[in-house]
Amino acid sequence: MLLKDLLYYQKMRQTAERGNEVIIKRDAYLNKLIERQNNGMVKVITGIRRCGKSFLLFKLYKEYLLNNGVNADHIIEIALDGIDVDELRNPKVCYSYIKEKIIDNDMYYILLDEVQFMDRFEEVLNSLLRIENVDVYVTGSNSRFLSKDIITEFRGRGDEIRIYPLTFAEFFSAYGGEYDDAWDEYLNYGGLPALIDMNNTKQKMDYLKGIFDNVYLKDVIERNRIKNKDEISILVDILASAIGTPTNPTKISNTFATERHSNYTHKTISAHIDFLEEAYLISKANRYDIKGRKYIAANLKYYFIDVGLRNARLNFRQQEPTHLMENVVYNELLARGYSVDVGMVEVNQRNHEGKKVRKQLEVDFVTNMGNGRYYIQVAYDLSTEEKQQQEYNSFRNIPDSFKKIVIVNGSSKPWRNDEGYVIMGMKYFLLNNDSLDF
């Protein structure tokens, strides 16, 4: 951990103790922890670093435990990313430390932060699970060290809770200003919680640039032993500039070969994209053939887990509102628990010569939860007939009756057009958790 980051978190915790901190409610995540309390499983809180995992566990959930009768000496907290607890990264030392604190038969709550910093952490967690009066919670910032291990090592005894940067509604609740100003702020700088207390533009920009290079990208490079730092750095820039557009590793490789005379193979590029996804920096949206009811492996789309980080990577240039809106909607849907794909509808149309040709129309998002499905288009506006047709044509060729929604920029309340499609403003969508059920 960087010294300035350590000092920041120390200050954050001290401020919280004084009662002066702006508390951002994260009730959805807190309720998930409460629902899973004492269920005999390891609760694994995952997500990008600095998105609020530690605050959720060590502040909000600990406060809940204390307010509901748990004694402070029955809550064992260990933050494994700090230099002051370096010795506890040794699995045997950590396990012994915890065991020594368990001195009676009452329930103990073990809170371990950034558990991937400990070698063989799976063995420690499995050992803790064998203690009857222990309830274990851990956080981690890399899915390869967590999600796969949850499945293989815990054999059904791991319960993953995914945390995202602040949604707009969470951000707005702490912003203290008007919607339009908050929306501009969010679209530029994103939803990392630390930004809430920053007062000027330069401070926010410097923070986002610094944390990307010195924390996120550095973690990816070091964990995966990447030798050529320049190549993956440029790859990140390419992905940042191409949010919402199909990504082809072979084409990227060819670009490196012709423009940089670099042998950056498509296999290496694919592996590096996987590393970025495992670190929760980006998220993959699969392409789904709606008529054929099958997935298409080629030309996947990638979105950044936070638009502020994406913008920082490009020095706050290339601020295309529609693509940024699309990224925000994608992240919002994930945070609400939907699975999200990019839809494709194949149609036969006549070209300017009157010949029938096959054409692929796109649906920005196909979202699913349980038996429910929604088709969603994201548009900056629908002010012209041409723009309306562009968004509606895909819907017209979908052979089912699931709800079809267009989200547009602005504050308009939802309404239905003559074809039954729901049109709603971004404000309504973001600030109403059940907005898709209008």
Language-model features: locations:
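A cross-kingdom feature that marks ATP-driven nucleic-acid transaction machinery
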Residues: 1-22, 46, 55, 66, ...
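Interdomain motor-coupling "hinge/lid" segment immediately C-terminal to the ATP-binding subdomain
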Residues: 2-16, 141-143, 148-246, 250, ...
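Pre-Walker A adenine-sensing motif
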Residues: 19-38
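Walker A/P-loop nucleotide-binding motif
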Residues: 40-58
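Short glycine-rich substrate-engagement loop in P-loop NTPases that contacts/grips substrate
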Residues: 76-105
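Conserved ATPase-coupling elements of RecA-like P-loop NTPase cores
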Residues: 87-90, 116-125, 148-150
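Conserved P-loop NTPase "ATPase switch" module shared by AAA+ and STAND
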Residues: 103-121
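Conserved catalytic/switch belt of AAA+ P-loop NTPases
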Residues: 122-138, 152
